[in-house]
Structures are given as structure tokens and as C-alpha cells.
């Protein structure tokens, strides 16, 4: 099983671009699990992509009540431990997406970035 995080900006809303990019990156993968942080934007579009492709979804929602502002970063670290790769949709501004990219690189997880 190939576990790939699809993450990115909460303002990212171009599903066709996400689908085309993910299709390209995942073209040689057979058994795929989409890993989602459950945020609006790219994460939710990644879930839509998973449903369209009949890929299972591993959900990692941030626990904002327990961890406050640190919840997103804690969630990113958990996804980084679990996943085999990251596909990030980044506007070069989102701190949460930057943290996910940095976490993946630190864990030596192959990372593809779609800049928007």
C-alpha cells in the first residue's frame, strides 16, 4: 500500500488541477491510500479525489480543543510518520503547508509540490 498525503492551502479550490497533478504523480501506483488532514481546501479536494478513484482515506483531523494553535503542526507530524509520500498544493505563503513540506523533507518522504 502506498500512503500519500494530499495537503495544501485552505484557499486552494482547483479540483481539475489537483486531479491532473495527482493522476500524473500516482500513475504507476496501484494500491493507494490518501492521507487527509481534514482541512478545507486542498485536503478536502484530496478526499474528493480519493472517492472518485475508490482509494481509501486515512483521516488525521487536528485536535484543536486539546492542542490549540499547535494542533495543525502536531497533526502534520503524525501524518509524516504514517505516510510514504506528500503531494502539496502551496501558494508559498501558507505556514501550515510549509510545515507539512518541511516535516516530509525532514522524514525523507518523497515530496511533490504544485505551486499556485
Language-model features: locations:
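Glycine-rich phosphate-binding "P-loop"
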Residues: 1-16
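Acidic/glycine-enriched connector segments
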Residues: 12-116
